Amino acid sequence: MARPNTSEVRNLSDADINEKIDGLRRELFQLRFEQATRQLANTHRFKEARIKLAQLLTVQSERQRSTAS
């Protein structure tokens, strides 16, 4: 799963960003559950999901700050 460019993330609508954030939070929860039950084989998925989530949250907060100004 390739990491999206920041420019690609910035082109998404607010609803799409919120949807992707919710999906990634669910994915991270599922990954933690799999790790706790020793079913997780690909531990690099944690890093990928956290980086994608950080990108989305950064763009979301940038938009919130720009509308507040």
From Swiss-Prot:
Answer whether the UniProt record assigns the keyword Ribonucleoprotein to this protein: yes
Write out the similarity annotation.
Belongs to the universal ribosomal protein uL29 family.
Q: Which GO terms describe its cellular component?
A: cytosolic large ribosomal subunit
One Gene Ontology molecular-function label:
structural constituent of ribosome
Q: Name one GO biological process term.
A: translation
Name of the molecule in the record: Large ribosomal subunit protein uL29
Q: Which UniProt keywords apply?
A: Ribonucleoprotein, Ribosomal protein
Highest rank taxon of the organism? Bacteria
